[in-house]
Amino acid sequence: MKRERHQDVFTERLPAKAAQDAKQLRKLAGDWLKLRRADAELSQADLAARLGLKYYTFISQVENGFSRVPTEIMGAWARELGLEQAAFARHLLMYYEPELYRLLFGAESK
């Protein structure tokens, strides 16, 4: 069964009362990444292979909030998901560094 691709994958915002706990924010980012991977119809193993990662379990670690997408492969990760690189990086910054995101783009920016 083919999954319907989400129309605007960058419209999500952090919940207004989201705890600024890094683990919780990484989990929210991981949930978003998992949806994008599903939209691209890739398994964790497929994505890991395309990114040149030795272990596909790293994808699971990121999607479950135990790790972050490394900056060095962020562009490649975006490409493999069919997303624009700068928008992908900006969206992840919202979760990984919310205060920096706010300073750069303002509180109401998406």
Residue ranges of each PLM-predicted region?
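DNA major-groove recognition helix of helix-turn-helix/homeodomain DNA-binding modules
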Residues: 5-8, 70-88
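Core residues of bacterial helix-turn-helix
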Residues: 40, 51-52, 62, 81
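A short, Lys/Arg-rich alpha-helix, primarily the initiator
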Residues: 3-39
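Key DNA-contact positions within bacterial/archaeal DNA-binding proteins
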Residues: 45, 56-57, 86
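Recognition helix of helix-turn-helix/homeodomain-like DNA-binding domains
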Residues: 52-69
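Short basic helix-loop element that most often maps to the first helix and adjoining turn
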Residues: 30-50, 76, 108
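Short, charged recognition helix plus adjacent turn
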Residues: 79, 87-110
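DNA major-groove recognition helix of helix-turn-helix
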Residues: 62-63, 73, 92
